[in-house]
């Protein structure tokens, strides 16, 4: 079985549907139906010979000129040892020279409880006369899936449990007494049902993970009573995982059998299950990888909790609640952490890289449907690659996957995961480049503004009133909707996008508009007439996005942005309240300011779409941004969100524009690193506020510090999207990743100085532009800029969640003030402002860098002192005690 498929099935516990490759999405897709003809008769004869294990009869189907070695190998594969059942399914046919038809055929063979699915390319040649039978002229294997098992519980053998203890990394299952049943493959037991009262103990070593467990359960360990368990494991691990002395055979009890079979039938299909419904009615599954374990544990408080150890995953321990779609704990085991270290990139496991996209998509807004044709230029990264996994919305039907080099290709649907696996007809070497053409059609639900945008959507509004005026419909297809076939992770590539919409709609997409929208000549119903927009992304982008709505083109401008200019376009929905000149000037000013800090703008054009809405927010894909505009008369007020800065209304705009640099030009290596996008965009909005409106910084810092302190106990910045995930409260995510992250950058700036900070930020941007970075990459750049080690700073503020407590005292003499700081806990690096207010009303601020257990500094005085305070400017994430 290809390694990509093993990782897909075994590591991620997916349920897949091996449906017809050209017939559409969904489970149990019917195979291509061909008329009864000479080819059909040939395939029936092939199936009969294979099912009978008759190698001689199968070889008799070959043409006289066929390559005997390859044909004999094929015959041996499907007949030896004799199968118990064979299904031959034609998937595609295409004409070749001299009347030859090239067939794509799947052959499924069962031998006992083991199954094998092979995909073969067969050239069939007609006989010399119409009455002569067709013959096999050549045969070659395209792909094979082995290790399929028709698992069933062994109800003939029941075991008494006597103090059974099952251990997996950071998990212990104790069952003092009860009943057990096994399900086995020829290699040994691979599944177990445990019936009886016991206890599960999940104890993650990582502090951040223990915090998440505490949020769920009220304690740092998840210790829960259970009454049944279902386990999956490698047959080769059974002896190490299960103490056989704890299992004693006993007389089978029919009541226990009914219970165990019910548990097995309910829980076994949840993992490693393969749906072959169009060729077999049986349930087929794969075995877990060596050292992998899946445990479904039914608890009293939380229902069924799933533990999965998937050794091929970068974070190989996962505990989650399937029913509520809630991740409880995801982290790297101690063994893997010792081998690899903390940092990793999601790209490390990729078999290929997408270099370019060419998308032609027709949108039907009234049905939220897409008819698309996507071409992908792909470069193979790993030797031996025989399949490619792509992301694409599960709701669409795939009309076909093609390659100019290989013709029509088979694909496998991954149910529930918005994924397809494309089988290649041969193993490809690293460095090979090819084009894929994916044709698809069907509904795709538009994407809601998500956590990557500043969406004020949590908590009750101050006044619960509704706006009765209907809002202009808008349909956003971006990084979460999988509206086009793409890599399994965000992946930098260039792109050309052609978007066709009804004549009364407009479109904005990733890329520079290259021509005015075209409209077919003639009149008629606007819903039937359509127009096409074309966009060119000449510089690499992480993902592609489209928004379809009714837009008015308001303004455009050319902006100097560092080493190059940017074409700016302003558009809005019809009723969005927009001050055109002010919006253009402010947007241009923000873009130019950011470019002055970092050296350039990443993309040659930018479109700002202003959309009417009942709440603030926005979304910023490459090349454009959508910014919500509150309709006049709206009485809904969202004051309790951490990122709602009412005294600086341009903050949303500044944040979204900053994403063109942070989040788009520079991406993040994995979800832990999302602060490199959100916190950086947030802090650049702070920098713009500091420049644009004198006196705005203290209020912004005060709100950021307050909300960061309130939410810090929920976990560190490095936890990413999982902050607030268990509680279902996105405000926690925004308070920590947005606000605390921005505060960390502000503290870093004050710790290392202006020149080092801004020089380091520019160097980081220029070095990592159009690549994905991590916290360690950022730290190393800033260390070079500052000329000092910053490991402790990042360990505390990015990877830690504690808030330091610092005791502050001061002593005044006639000419100087002596200030002393004592860190009451672990020593951290923190710059703290000492504010001296003189009786004259003059205020002096001095930044004192704290890097030791005790810090003392003498400050010359300029007059009689009224007060002396520490951290009055709220610029440090510390608690000051007097």
Task: List each language-model region with its residue ranges.
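Extended, low-hydrophobicity, Ser/Thr/Pro/Gly-biased non-transmembrane segments
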Residues: 227, 233-351, 437-551
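Hydrophobic helix-coil surface modules that form long, contiguous segments used
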Residues: 341, 347-373, 379-384, 391-394, ...
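Non-catalytic accessory/interaction domains
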Residues: 290, 298-338, 343, 349, ...
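Short solvent-exposed beta->alpha transition segments
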Residues: 29-113, 776, 780, 784, ...
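Hydrophobic alpha-helical and helix-loop surface patches within well-folded domains
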Residues: 22, 418, 535, 567-823
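A surface-exposed beta-strand-loop module
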Residues: 147-165, 169-256, 385-388, 393-459, ...
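Exposed beta-sheet edge and beta->alpha loop/turn motif
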Residues: 94-150, 839
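Bacterial N-terminal signal peptides
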Residues: 7-21
């Amino acid at each position: 079985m290809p390694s990509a498929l093993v990782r897909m099935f075994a590591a991620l516990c997916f349920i897949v549907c091996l449906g017809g490759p050209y017939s559409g999405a969904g489970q149990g897709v019917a195979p291509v139906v061909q008329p009864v003809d000479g080819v059909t008769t040939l395939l029936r004869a092939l199936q009969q010979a294979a099912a009978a294990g008759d190698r001689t009869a199968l070889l008799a189907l070959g043409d006289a000129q066929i390559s005997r070695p390859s044909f004999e190998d094929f015959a041996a594969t499907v007949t030896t040892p004799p199968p118990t059942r064979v299904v031959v399914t034609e998937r595609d046919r295409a004409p070749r020279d001299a009347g030859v038809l090239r067939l794509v055929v799947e052959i499924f063979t069962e031998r006992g409880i083991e199954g094998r699915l092979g995909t073969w390319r067969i050239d069939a040649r007609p006989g010399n006369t119409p009455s002569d039978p067709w013959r096999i002229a050549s045969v070659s294997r395209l792909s094979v899936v082995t290790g399929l098992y028709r698992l069933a519980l062994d109800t003939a053998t029941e075991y008494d449990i006597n103090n059974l203890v099952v251990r997996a990394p950071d998990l212990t299952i104790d069952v003092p007494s009860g009943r057990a049943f096994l399900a086995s493959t020829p290699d040994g037991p691979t599944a177990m049902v445990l019936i009886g009262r016991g206890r599960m103990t999940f104890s993650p070593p990582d502090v951040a993970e223990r915090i998440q467990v505490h949020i769920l359960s009220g304690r740092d360990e998840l210790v829960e009573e259970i009454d049944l368990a279902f386990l999956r494991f490698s047959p080769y691990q059974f002896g190490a995982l299960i103490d056989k002395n704890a299992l004693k055979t006993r007389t089978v009890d029919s009541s226990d059998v009914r219970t165990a079979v019910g548990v097995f039938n309910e829980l076994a299909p949840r993992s490693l299950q393969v749906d072959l419904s169009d060729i077999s009615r049986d349930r087929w599954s794969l075995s877990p990888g060596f050292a992998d374990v899946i445990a479904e544990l039914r608890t009293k408080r939380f229902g069924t909790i799933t533990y999965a150890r998937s050794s091929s995953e970068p974070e190989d321990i996962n505990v989650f609640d399937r029913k509520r779609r809630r991740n409880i704990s995801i982290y790297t085991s101690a063994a893997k952490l010792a081998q690899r270290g903390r940092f990793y990139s999601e790209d490390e496991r990729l078999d290929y890289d997408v270099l370019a996209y060419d998308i032609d998509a027709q949108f039907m807004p009234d049905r939220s449907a897409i008819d698309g044709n996507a071409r992908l230029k792909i470069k193979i990264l790993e030797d031996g690659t025989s399949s490619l996994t792509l992301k694409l919305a599960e709701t669409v039907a795939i009309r076909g996957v093609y390659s100019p080099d290989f013709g029509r290709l088979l694909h496998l649907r991954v149910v529930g995961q918005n994924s397809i696996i494309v089988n290649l007809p041969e193993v490809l070497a690293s460095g090979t480049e090819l084009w894929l053409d994916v044709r698809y059609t069907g509904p795709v639900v538009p994407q809601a503004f998500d956590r990557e945008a500043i969406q004020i959507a949590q908590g009750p509004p101050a006044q619960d009133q509704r706006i009765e005026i209907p809002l202009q419909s808008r349909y956003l297809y971006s990084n979460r909707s999988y509206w086009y076939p793409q890599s399994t992770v965000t992946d930098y590539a260039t792109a050309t996008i052609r978007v066709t919409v009804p004549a009364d709609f407009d479109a904005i997409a990733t890329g520079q508009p290259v021509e005015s929208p075209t409209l077919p000549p003639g009149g008629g119903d606007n819903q039937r007439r359509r127009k096409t927009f074309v966009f060119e992304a000449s510089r690499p982008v992480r993902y592609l996005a489209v928004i379809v709505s009714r837009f008015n083109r308001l303004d455009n401008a050319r902006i100097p942005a560092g080493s190059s200019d940017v074409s700016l376009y302003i558009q809005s929905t019809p009723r969005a309240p927009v001050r055109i000149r002010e919006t253009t000037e402010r947007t241009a000013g923000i873009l130019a300011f950011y470019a002055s800090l970092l050296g350039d703008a990443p993309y040659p054009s930018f479109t700002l779409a202003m959309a009417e809405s009942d709440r603030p927010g926005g979304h910023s894909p490459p090349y454009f941004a959508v910014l919500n505009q509150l309709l006049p008369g709206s009485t809904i007020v969202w004051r309790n969100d951490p990122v709602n800065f009412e005294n600086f209304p341009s903050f949303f705009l500044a944040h979204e524009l900053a994403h063109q640099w942070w989040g788009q030009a520079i991406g993040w290596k994995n979800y832990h690193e999302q602060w490199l996008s959100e916190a950086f965009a947030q802090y650049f909005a702070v920098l713009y506020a500091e420049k644009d409106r004198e006196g705005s910084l203290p209020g912004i810092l005060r709100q950021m510090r307050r909300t960061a302190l309130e939410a810090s106990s929920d976990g560190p910045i490095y936890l990413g999207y999982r902050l607030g995930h268990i509680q279902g409260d996105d405000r926690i995510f925004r308070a920590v990743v947005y606000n605390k992250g921005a505060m960390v950058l502000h503290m870093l700036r004050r710790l290392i100085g202006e020149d080092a900070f801004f020089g380091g930020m520019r160097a980081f941007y220029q070095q990592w532009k159009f690549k994905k970075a991590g916290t360690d990459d950022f730290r190393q750049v800033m260390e070079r800029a500052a000329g000092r080690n910053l490991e402790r700073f990042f360990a505390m503020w990015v990877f830690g969640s504690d808030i330091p407590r610092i005791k502050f005292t001061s002593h005044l003499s006639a000419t100087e003030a002596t200030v002393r700081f004592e860190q009451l806990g672990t020593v951290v690096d923190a710059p703290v402002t000492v504010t001296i207010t003189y009786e004259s009303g003059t205020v002096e601020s001095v930044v004192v860098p704290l890097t030791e257990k005790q810090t003392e500094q003498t400050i010359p005085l300029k007059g009689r002192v009224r007060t002396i305070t520490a951290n009055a400017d709220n610029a440090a994430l510390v608690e000051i005690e007097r």
